[in-house]
Amino acid sequence: MAIALAWLLVPLAALAAPYADYVIDVRTGEVLHQDNADTRLHPASLTKMMTLYIAFEAIERGEITLDSKVTISKHAASMPPSKLGLKPGQTIALRYLIRAAAIKSANDAATAIGEAIEGSEPAFAKRMNRTAKALGMTRSTFVNANGLTAKGHLSTAHDMTILGRHLFYDYPQYYNIFSRTSADAGVAQVASTNRRFLAAYKGADGIKTGYTQAAGFNLVASAQRGNKHVIATVFGGKSTADRNARAAQLLDMGFGKAPNRAAVQKPARPAYTGTEPPELLVEDTTDEDDALAEAIARAVTTAPDAVPAGKTIRLKVAVVQSPRPRTRPLPGATEPADAPAEELLLAMQDDIAD
């Protein structure tokens, strides 16, 4: 009986949650340290980094705007805490859902974002998985938009670090939301779940916390000092304090190893994003190639933004593209589009984060 009582006194998070970490030089992508980094573990609310990445992508592609009014479903409203407290039938601007998901880590807001973009959470999860594959997150699979524990909803310290780097380089106009310690989320003023780390670690600028009983205490931490920029990801911390201390130690290690000067090598933005099929290049078409092209065309007609059915182009180069405006690089490009001008960046950041 005494042994049983002793077990009951041990925090559940301390009994579970395998540990993993990963540290990179953000400028080059160079790995500075790793431990258990490719083990598939529960990401918890680190998941919302992918939800937000897709939200930024959808805004850029013209699928939705920051001012779009989102009607909250019963499903989204039913999500457990952390939450914004949204009610079924309530309408709220997408910008407030983004703030709530990024800063407060609100599960109802994250679910509502997914439903607003893809119509349902399962459809959004499929898009999350397509995007993960395109980003090179080869050991991540997503089931929901918020990170609540679910069978098959897993990622790695390596993959979440890749995602953090892409958020920084692919969407610089929105990245500063991750450094905010509070924000107006429309129906409430929300405080950051990462505010302690942001306040305590010099140069910290994000990115996202995560916690569930199965995951333990997770964090993708980013900091910039001088010319250096390091991301350190921690999975399976024993507490908020333990997680933050580990992240600080890893960042210190990273800053110590990273050279003062390094040529920036931005990650290539994915050629295949969202509901858009991969571009197909066929030099000498065969029956097998033609069948593949037709299969891709058929897949497009089942997507939420389907092109007109029956329009299959069978040339030397068969390209199927989304009808929306794009700022993606051309096929073969190694660099993303240029960042907006400084004054435009500031205005866009104010739109979402202030």
Predicted regions and their residues:
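Active-site-adjacent loops and short helices of periplasmic peptidoglycan-processing enzymes
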Residues: 11-157, 168
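Domain-terminus/edge residues, biased toward the C-terminal soluble/receptor-binding domains
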Residues: 137-141, 149-154, 158-354
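Bacterial N-terminal signal peptides
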Residues: 1-11
